[in-house]
């Protein structure tokens, strides 16, 4: 009877969180989900509550809180069945913070890392398609940045750093729209330097 009463308390607290989330009171929802996990850590709903708390923060654009919650989830529940979702949401939380691709390098790299990890380790997850799509967008951003810096070095006649930047596009981002310009620039520089054999490659 006592166990039944405890199970009921856990479920009621969880449902309160869901109800608050549906009504838009996301901070209260996050608090209720955290409460379930804190007071009933052995409950089957504990890991799910942690994920729901993270989602509540995400909905409100509290990305740092969302990331902290998800990081903790991965440490506390390393064998949970929803690890794919946690890694996907980490990628999304960083992805949503990319406002200026020239400045938000940290968020770009972190999002890229989580999406790549998800696709590599959970290729059949339902989140893989969206992760792949966003990964291609991120690669476009990174390739664009490499090309921009490469052009800067060309203008300054700093050929070796320019070559390195264009090679980065060719080696790392060959599926992006910037591959053709990168190849053209490499050929152009090699001809300028008299390296015709290199240009032919």
Where are the regions that the model predicts?
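Acidic, polar-rich low-complexity tracts and alpha-helical solenoid repeat scaffolds
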Residues: 1-201
């Amino acid at each position: 009877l006592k166990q039944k009463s405890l199970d009921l308390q856990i479920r009621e607290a969880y449902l309160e969180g869901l109800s608050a989330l549906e009504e838009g009171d996301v901070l209260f929802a996050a608090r209720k989900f955290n409460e379930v996990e804190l007071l009933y850590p052995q409950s089957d709903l504990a890991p799910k509550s942690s994920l729901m708390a993270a989602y509540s923060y995400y909905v409100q654009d509290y990305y740092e809180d969302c990331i902290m919650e998800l990081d903790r989830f991965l440490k506390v529940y390393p064998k949970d069945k929803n690890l794919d979702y946690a890694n996907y949401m980490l990628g999304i939380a960083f992805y949503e913070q990319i406002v200026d691709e020239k400045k938000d390098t940290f968020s770009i790299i972190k999002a890229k890392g989580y999406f790549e990890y998800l696709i590599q380790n959970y290729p059949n997850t339902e989140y893989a398609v969206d992760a792949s799509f966003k990964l291609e967008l991120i690669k476009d951003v990174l390739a664009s940045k490499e090309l921009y810096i490469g052009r800067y070095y060309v203008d300054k006649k700093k050929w070796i750093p320019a070559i390195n930047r264009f090679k980065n596009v060719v080696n790392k981002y060959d599926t992006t729209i910037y591959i053709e310009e990168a190849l053209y620039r490499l050929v152009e520089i090699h001809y300028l330097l008299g390296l015709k054999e290199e240009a032919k490659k």
